[in-house]
Amino acid sequence: MRWVRAVFALVFCLSAGGRSGVAQKTQAPASATVTVSAGDLSAQPVGANWTSYNGDYSGRRYSTLNEITTANVSQLRAAWVFHPGNSQRLEVTPVVVRGIMYITSANDVFALDAGTGRDVWHYQRPVSSGLLDDAAAHKNRGVAVWQDSVYVETDDAHLLRLDARSGGLIWDVEYAEKSKHYGATSAPLAVKDEIIVGSSGGDSGVRGFVAAFDALTGKQKWRFWTIPGPGEFGSSSWPGQAYLYGGATTWMPGTYDPALNTVYWTTSNAAPDFVGDTRPGDDLYTACVLALDPDSGKLKWYFQFTPHDLYDYDANETPVLIDTREKGVTRRLLVQANRNGFFYVLDRTDGKFFGATPFVEKLNWAKKIDSSGRPVLSGRIPSAEGTYICPGIEGATNWFSPSYNPSTGLFYFMALESCNTYFAKARPFTQGETYYNTGTKRPPDEQSQKILLAYSVPERKLVWRYPQAGRGDSWGGTLTTAGGLLFFADDAGSLEAVDATNGQPLWHFNTGQRIDASPMSYAVDGMQYVSVAAGSDIFSFSLPH
């Protein structure tokens, strides 16, 4: 094992503020030299490879692998465990291409032999100081891969390009100013010849955006600001300088429809939280899904889930792309289980609203969603004395990943039954401080519960539910497979498998750690594996050899 300096494919660093990292390398297997093709990235659904955060562009987290089935999943056992060593709460979904797994932990990137868990190379970069909110916790959800390169966002909003063969740094681009308290927690998305990124910091008083960079050179190709500037459509919500710190950050990866050539990206809450006097109106484009042209960054359409959000109901949950046949008509849909407690169905070609139904029982901020897609409010808003509001600040669901199985026709996701008392007290924006006005508390007798839900999109109804034991404080998501299975991270620290048709429990493995990530599946030499980040470790499971 030897230490090497990062290998620079470009002789300059594109960011004057960039910090060099180092790559530690062991003997790499031959498959580490493969190139990730456009066909690999556009394959839908995925099989042996898992080429992006959600597996494929659609966001369905569905694997065609079927070696592991309802009949043999009880034999599943841990094949290997890898400990990155620098994070206690991993949130990464591994990416696997031809037997090589890429994971992140804080600002570090690892390449592993996906069959054994053996370390191939390790790129190290120090964590940043002086950050706020989620970025200060150095959370990172994974990488993007393109040709012979690996791309990662750092906690201080740099985009790095690494050599997939060695882990050497090729270039480093600062795409948002740390001095303004931008950060990043997401995995990038590779589309065509560009890498698309977002930012965190919506509760820290920043202006959100989605940006695309040339995958070869790192040069910015376009940037779409999610808070409109003066004179732009929607700017009436942002008087004076309010647009500069209005939030609408983009802290989860989007999805992409190659046939429509459209990227779908979601945005966070408006800032300040809980008090809306300084941001009258709908507060575009907060709590939205945006349909963007990946070639130009121009907005095609948008849909806002929670106009004038006072509850911290980010819309950053995955916008999943599915096709259904309803009444003899094939529909290209975008569906989302939203943090506000409603399940939305949209036409992804133009954003037309098809309907929204509640999926939790604890819901009192709105009475319903009307025929135009707007909420009919109940009048419950944060107050100085405190107001009991459901869902609570963590939402009826959150960023933990959903999945969709085309064989069952069911959409799976984790829901949270929980409420909070919301308090409001206006205060001015101060650079360098979080922009909460003011906060929430959980009532002493409030019992939160996670529930695994299966939802039929054509029928617009819940089909089955699987309540979880625990405190409702884990953040694990779901994976569904052609083996008739649904894997998910439960609230007790276990990876669990149930029958995707009816939710019947079939297998579980307790990791002994809280799971704040979502499972994925891949194959090496014809053998199927299921992998998940649990606590500070990566676990990979397979049937006995």
Task: Indicate residue ranges for each PLM-predicted region.
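Blade/loop signatures of beta-propeller domains
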Residues: 25-78, 226-233, 374-377, 441-442, ...
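Short coil/turn segments that connect the beta-strands within blades of beta-propeller domains
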Residues: 47-48, 98-100, 147-148, 192-194, ...
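N-terminal cofactor/phosphate-binding cores enriched in small/glycine residues
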Residues: 63-176, 480-481
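Extracytoplasmic beta-rich repeat domains
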Residues: 82-93, 122-144, 169-187, 204, ...
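Short loop/turn segments that connect beta-strands within beta-propeller blades
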Residues: 114-116, 163-166, 215-217, 294-296, ...
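A detector of repeated loop/turn-to-beta-strand junctions in beta-rich toroidal repeat architectures
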Residues: 156, 206-209, 284-286, 331, ...
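Blade-level signature of beta-propeller repeat domains, shared across WD40, Kelch, NHL, RCC1
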Residues: 517-545
